[in-house]
Amino acid sequence: MRGELPNKHHSYTFFVFLFFFLILFPDLSISVNTLSATESLTISSNKTIVSPGGVFELGFFRILGDSWYLGIWYKKISQRTYVWVANRDTPLSNPIGILKISNANLVILDNSDTHVWSTNLTGAVRSSVVAELLDNGNFVLRGSKINESDEFLWQSFDFPTDTLLPQMKLGRDHKRGLNRFVTSWKSSFDPSSGSFMFKLETLGLPEFFGFTSFLEVYRSGPWDGLRFSGILEMQQWDDIIYNFTENREEVAYTFRVTDHNSYSRLTINTVGRLEGFMWEPTQQEWNMFWFMPKDTCDLYGICGPYAYCDMSTSPTCNCIKGFQPLSPQDWASGDVTGRCRRKTQLTCGEDRFFRLMNMKIPATTAAIVDKRIGLKECEEKCKTHCNCTAYANSDIRNGGSGCIIWIGEFRDIRNYAADGQDLFVRLAAAEFGERRTIRGKIIGLIIGISLMLVLSFIIYCFWKKKQKRARATAAPIGYRDRIQELIITNGVVMSSGRRLLGEEEDLELPLTEFETVVMATENFSDSNILGRGGFGIVYKGRLLDGQEIAVKRLSEMSSQGTNEFKNEVRLIARLQHINLVRLLSCCIYADEKILIYEYLENGSLDSHLFETTQSSNKLNWQTRFSIINGIARGLLYLHQDSRFKIIHRDLKASNVLLDKNMTPKISDFGMARIFERDETEANTRKVVGTYGYMSPEYAMEGIFSVKSDVFSFGVLVLEIVSGKRNRGFHNSGQDNNLLGYTWENWKEGKGLEIVDSIIVDSSSSMSLFQPHEVLRCIQIGLLCVQERAEDRPKMSSVVLMLGSEKGEIPQPKRPGYCVGRSSLDTADSSSSTKRDSESLTVNQITVSVINAR
């Protein structure tokens, strides 16, 4: 007995120590991964459920304010990253809430015992159930017996929020009547359902769509046996194994990672972009390895029917062989809304098929699919169906199999450099150079000669009429009245739709006779052409008194040219600023519409920045810094100091002109819009502008504001510093645009890496390189191109930052449309914190057209 007393003493000591240890350190108590029918989880207890391997954690949380949610996040990751939220649309309004099992259902109750959320299971009620958090992040409800552990009564994987985890399925479960899809958060701090969804459409051949307000934004393309046809990168993901299942019971996509110790997720962010992340343990941050949409061609139906998008061409939209623009003038100016139409009408039974290679095939929601036949039978099936317009294989494995045929219009196709799919488009035989019969040739010859005679007569009459007009020595009667009728009676239309000017207000703008313009430009001689714009040609001219002018002759055929003419005359005639181009007069004669500007000797900024000529040597750093300041002051005048609050909407290097002293002047106000003083933003069904300069919210959702111009200014600043275009910029070994390249260098403390070599050329006597000014401009440029509009500074702040050498400047966040493989900042990495760098949440609006140049 004596020998046992010391052992008992040690046992008592151990239990006393353990008791006090657990009291003093409750957070270090053993975590559980289950919740039984007799247990509960409350906000006040601050307890959580942890998966067996400590990978995931479930508990109550809040981000801002008094709204509480039940969610799941990664346990071992320092950055709180939420992957599932139970009551996302029914938050608890105060810190009194409880999760428990009631009647074989999981329920969340508020302080009045009201059901805030429930699993809503019906039918036979089991006597004993238990909830469990698994190591794959799945929160399940199952029977409490050991042999029932694999039978889930309910699981969170069937009800995703904004994130898809490995082993989680996205798509339809026909057997259980489930449709699993992800929905964005409403904002960075609000987990409730946002405006964007990524879900499966099973009409035709199953494929995923990105939606906003049930309007398609982008499309994955159908599964072709190896990958989704619009996501070629899938075959390059060595660390991920993906699977697509299509049978009577389900149509679903899922993935898993090869390294079971690594973390990966697929998340739709607050602006609708689908992003793939992989956790980097050494860097302790999320690495974004993929996202969609990644470029303009990913936007759904961007080029309209019978056209394809190709990022390697300019313009990016191209009519398919055998088709032509309905309005060539509009198409050439960048307006692709006029659609493509057939050059030659089809003749059923005689038509042939043209092969388009390396394509993302059109949307299949209205297509007919037959997986039992091959390509040859598919061609015959399409040929005998007179309304069939195209066909392709449904599966590209083993030489191809299956058949898709499109009836009527098809849209949303793009061309890849390689690895795309073959699409066969139905064309008239004449498009292949088929020989016509003798009778057909004779008929064609007769018709052709007749048309030539008629056309010659019309041209002769037109020439005589023009000659008569050219001899006139005075403007026609009512010349000023006609201009007033064209311009003034329409008024200046503000973004709200209200007319700013009425018939009683007269334009204080000199009018020039057409004959004077003809003489000044030497009858619009080609030798006097300064440039060609989207709506016409600009000529250099000299008046009789020796004054040099720039003459903008708008296209006679373009209705947009007329609209631009009206808008520019109404706006710029009332604006006076040293950094805005000055409109001297205008001229309207017959169908001619002409604007006359001051002539600026040094031309446009882009000719100095991007063309390898001697003119680029004029741009030492002091000149560039002066240009940046001048553009900023001009924009500030438009946004704040002018009579009207004006949004330019097309600020770019080619729309900044330089006088003999290299003073910058903003030009081309044809796309500008006027705001009320208390108006902050507006939206449009027709997005106009230039790719590379458009802000994300404007390009994708049609929302524009002063912050849209700020974004364009930021792009322009980085182009001035680097001497490189944002659009078309490619860095060796990377897939970034200029914004992404600048951002990566800035994060690594290598901001000066992007600077134009001409600026730092020590051998140049003109070089006055100031590194601190350059870095300040790069930082300001990055602030201006931040993804969220609300994060961008106003132009008043930009002017102040440019002029202050000692003032503290905020650190920028990730830019909008940052292309390429990149690692997110620590502050931008989780589903809660990562959203801080995302764009402003947008309203549910309709964007029917993007008209960019």
UniProtKB/Swiss-Prot annotation:
Residues with attached carbohydrate: 46, 120, 147, 243, 387
Modification sites for Phosphoserine: 558, 654, 667, 831
Extracellular side: 32-441
Domain Bulb-type lectin: 34-154
Binding positions for ATP per the UniProt entry: 530-538, 552
GO cellular component: plasma membrane
Role description: Female specificity determinant of self-incompatibility.
Protein name: G-type lectin S-receptor-like serine/threonine-protein kinase SRK
Gene: SRK
